[in-house]
From Swiss-Prot:
Originating species: Cricetus cricetus
Record-given protein name: Small ribosomal subunit protein eS26
Chief localisation class: cytoplasm
GO molecular function, one term: mRNA binding
Locations listed in the record: Cytoplasm, Cytosol; Cytoplasm; Rough endoplasmic reticulum
Chain positions covered by the region annotation Disordered: 85-115
General function of this protein: Component of the small ribosomal subunit. The ribosome is a large ribonucleoprotein complex responsible for the synthesis of proteins in the cell.
Subunit structure: Component of the 40S small ribosomal subunit.
Protein encoded by which gene: RPS26
Length: 115
């Protein structure tokens, strides 16, 4: 029978079993290696309130903390929420990650400061 994908839609190679995780969206059980993972870094405070909080802060150079979340989606939720989309037979073989989204007016990120 023909195969749709070289990796059968998952990252399990020599392992017999992979522990299941729950989809963030619908709570369906999905094998951890098959789940579509999305790492999100957001400010805890929404963009509209950042200036108000920084002005009200006692500390002048206080950096607002960020929220680091790894979202796990089942295949159907990832397609529905447009995290991934179905691709043609030839495009499926392309393993390069999609280009990183940067807003048009954003400056390139400065290099990290040495400690």
């Amino acid at each position: 029978m023909t195969k749709k994908r070289r990796n059968n839609g998952r990252a399990k190679k020599g392992r017999g079993h992979v522990q299941p995780i729950r989809c963030t969206n619908c709570a369906r059980c999905v094998p951890k290696d098959k789940a579509i993972k999305k790492f999100v870094i957001r400010n805890i405070v929404e963009a509209a309130a950042v200036r108000d909080i920084s002005e009200a802060s006692v500390f002048d150079a206080y950096v607002l903390p960020k929220l680091y979340v790894e979202l796990h989606y089942c295949v159907s939720c990832a397609i529905h929420s447009k995290v991934v989309r179905n691709r043609s037979r030839e495009a499926r073989k392309d393993r390069t990650p999609p280009p990183r989204f940067r807003p048009a007016g954003a400056a390139p990120r400065p290099p990290p400061k040495p400690m």
